[in-house]
């Protein structure tokens, strides 16, 4: 602990944090700065004590208990006015360190620091156990940890706490962010032509009481808040010799998030997402009215990731058993060479030979990957909680930077469980809240729309009107696929027990893969689906179809909703995520009565369950 009668002040000069003591004998204690393996490291030792304070700007923070107490008690009240930038954020995170378990602390990797430099504490040995975390997974964790608090602050002026915690609204926030972060003019297509978009756009959100409302978002203000909160280039972890820019790494992080947003599984499964760092869709659709623009994030990842996938294929072919692999290797090699932008890349590509040894082949490939601004060809398995759960978790004062949820599925589930929406419930709460969440996730988002279903369902008034669909007229007891919608397959299956009349027929809906394309949110149709009776344009058949969608999709949350309805009003904590309500924690209810089977499940590839980084 600090000596009594001795005061400390903090100052920042470039990447150096200076700590000054007011006594004549101890003053100007300076933190050394060095470059090590591409990582900016600040090393601090309080002279005259055994306490050490380690800060690594592009990673997380570890401080021992005494220094933490000193920071809290002596300086945290006015530190914000004296310390700025990444150093301030690092010290603030150190104060929050007690919020996390010892296991989480051990998972924070201190790259580039040996045990002798760390004072022989053994901390580095524990952290090196987590070497399997890839650069991309780490960078995304850092990106989320710095950007999401700013997003939470920005949207808290537009959305209530309850509205921000609803899963579908979290997805909408990320789409509207992608729309805002454009360098040039924002444009959309109307009638086959590009038109400029206004700086203020409308966003459709679900309210906590089960209604749908529109809010206005200033895209320029959102863009400014987003770019100000992004990590700097020096904060990211990069491969040796990497020329990746701040924008390129940030765009990769946004592409990963958009991949999670567009995941087909999110139509049905709440909780943790398993994804890979390559293979992204080429476009996304925002929830803004009529907005459908190509994503520069996904375009960036397509340009880089496409080469990465080809290089992975070349390595996989090289390591495969003997056969006709030389010809295939040569074809892919020519494809990669055609995408090269510099002479160096062309020479490196030509130097890849199927007969080379493993070490030589890998060195050439790593250099080539770096020149394309991508990590060496590895595939990393990551776990991402729902966007809304992350925002809710941060909104409650937590930090994600000390949690390696990108690799640790348990921490990802922890975020889901702890991101709770506490609702002051009264007798007006009904099943409509859960049904609204389900309806918006399956019908009223960019994945699908009321218009598409209405056009595609046989028997509805607008069936096959103004739609490019390769279908035949429905026949009894058959399954049909709607195509040509720039969508994945949507199947409508006629059940055998139904009548011969198409208008009375009962349909079962199966949705596969991701939706995208020209889906537009239709408020009137959604209100009709929810039974408001405010629109007369939607046919009875569509309402019946949506009821079946709601019934099928809400099976997971049915037990939770039922238990909630019979529980004590106003004394419950409720979680809205995924398809709706996936977990409920009752206050004052015996532990044995709590619902435990609604926790999001973690999915592993059977072959990869024990692997951290997988060389393809």
Swiss-Prot record:
InterPro entries on file: NCAP_ISAV_C (IPR048894), NCAP_ISAV_hel (IPR049060), NCAP_ISAV_N (IPR049057)
Location, primary (coarse class): virion
Disulfide bond sites: none
Recorded GO CC terms: helical viral capsid; host cell; host cell nucleolus; viral nucleocapsid
Motif Nuclear localization signal in this chain: 230-233, 473-476
Keywords, sorted A to Z: Capsid protein, Helical capsid protein, Host nucleus, Viral nucleoprotein, Viral penetration into host nucleus, Virion, Virus entry into host cell
Family annotation (Pfam families): NCAP_ISAV_hel (PF21453), NCAP_ISAV_N (PF21451), NP_C_Orthomyx (PF21422)
Domain of life according to the entry: Viruses
Compartment list: Virion; Host nucleus; Host nucleus, Host nucleolus
GO biological process: symbiont entry into host cell; viral penetration into host nucleus
Function statement: Encapsidates the negative strand viral RNA, protecting it from nucleases. The encapsidated genomic RNA is termed the ribonucleoprotein (RNP) and serves as template for transcription and replication.
Self-association state and partner proteins as the record states: Homomultimerizes to form the nucleocapsid. Binds to viral genomic RNA. Protein-RNA contacts are mediated by a combination of electrostatic interactions between positively charged residues and the phosphate backbone and planar interactions between aromatic side chains and bases.
Name listed for the protein in its UniProt record: Nucleoprotein
Species this protein is from: Infectious salmon anemia virus (isolate Atlantic salmon/Norway/810/9/99) (ISAV)
Phylogenetic lineage: Viruses, Riboviria, Orthornavirae, Negarnaviricota, Polyploviricotina
Gene: Segment-3
């Amino acid at each position: 602990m600090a000596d009594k009668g001795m005061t400390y002040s903090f100052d920042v000069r470039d990447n150096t944090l200076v700590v000054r003591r007011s006594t004549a004998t101890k003053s100007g204690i300076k933190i050394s700065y060095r470059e090590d393996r591409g990582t900016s490291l600040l090393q601090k030792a309080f002279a005259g004590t055994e306490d050490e304070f380690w800060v690594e700007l592009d990673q997380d923070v570890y401080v021992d208990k005494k220094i933490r107490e000193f920071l809290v008690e002596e300086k945290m009240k006015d530190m914000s006015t004296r310390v700025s930038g990444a150093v301030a954020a690092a010290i603030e995170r150190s104060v929050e360190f007690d919020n996390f378990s010892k296991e989480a602390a051990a998972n924070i990797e201190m790259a580039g620091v040996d045990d002798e430099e760390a004072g022989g504490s053994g901390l580095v040995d524990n952290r090196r156990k987590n070497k399997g975390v890839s650069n991309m997974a780490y960078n995304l964790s850092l990106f989320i940890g710095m950007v999401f608090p700013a997003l939470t602050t920005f949207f808290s002026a537009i959305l209530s706490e309850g509205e921000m915690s609803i899963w579908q609204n979290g997805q909408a926030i990320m789409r509207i962010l992608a729309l805002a972060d454009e360098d040039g003019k924002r444009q959309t297509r109307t009638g086959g032509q590009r038109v400029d978009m206004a700086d203020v756009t409308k966003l459709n959100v679900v309210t906590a009481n089960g209604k749908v409302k529109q809010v206005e978002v200033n895209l320029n203000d959102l863009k400014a808040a987003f770019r100000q909160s992004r990590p700097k280039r020096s904060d990211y972890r990069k491969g040796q010799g990497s020329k990746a820019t701040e924008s390129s790494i940030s765009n990769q992080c946004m592409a990963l998030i958009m991949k999670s947003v567009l995941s087909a599984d999110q139509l049905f499964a709440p909780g943790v997402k398993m994804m890979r760092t390559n293979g992204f869709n080429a476009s996304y659709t925002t929830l803004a009215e009529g907005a459908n623009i190509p994503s520069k994030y996904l375009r960036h990842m397509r340009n880089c990731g496409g080469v990465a996938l080809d290089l992975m294929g070349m390595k996989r072919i090289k390591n495969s058993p003997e056969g006709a692999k030389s010809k295939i290797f040569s074809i892919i090699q020519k494809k990669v060479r055609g995408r090269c932008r510099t002479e160096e890349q062309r020479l490196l590509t030509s130097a890849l030979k199927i007969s080379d040894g493993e070490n030589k082949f890998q060195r050439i490939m790593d250099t080539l990957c770096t020149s394309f601004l991508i990590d060496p060809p590895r595939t990393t398995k990551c776990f991402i909680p729902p966007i809304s759960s992350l925002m809710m978790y941060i909104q409650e004062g937590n930090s994600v930077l000390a949690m390696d949820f990108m690799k640790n599925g348990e921490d990802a589930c922890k975020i889901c469980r702890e991101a709770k929406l506490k609702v002051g419930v009264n007798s007006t709460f009904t099943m409509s809240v859960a049904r609204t969440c389900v309806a918006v996730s399956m019908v009223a988002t960019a994945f699908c729309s009321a218009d598409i279903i209405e056009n595609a369902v046989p028997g509805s008034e607008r069936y096959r009107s103004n739609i490019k669909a390769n279908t035949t007229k429905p026949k009894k007891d058959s399954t049909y696929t709607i195509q040509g919608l720039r969508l994945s397959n949507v199947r409508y299956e006629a059940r055998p027990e139904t009548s011969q009349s198409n208008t009375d027929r009962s349909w079962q809906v199966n949705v596969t893969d991701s939706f995208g394309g020209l889906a537009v949110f239709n408020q009137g149709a959604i209100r009709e689906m929810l039974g408001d009776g405010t629109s007369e344009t939607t046919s009875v058949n569509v309402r019946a179809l949506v009821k079946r969608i709601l019934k099928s999709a809400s099976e997971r949350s049915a037990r939770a909703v039922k238990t909630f309805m019979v529980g004590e009003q106003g004394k419950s904590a409720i979680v809205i995520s995924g398809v709706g309500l996936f977990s409920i924690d009752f206050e004052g209810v015996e532990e044995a009565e709590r619902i435990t089977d609604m926790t999001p499940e973690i999915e592993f590839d059977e072959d990869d369950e024990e692997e951290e980084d997988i060389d393809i």
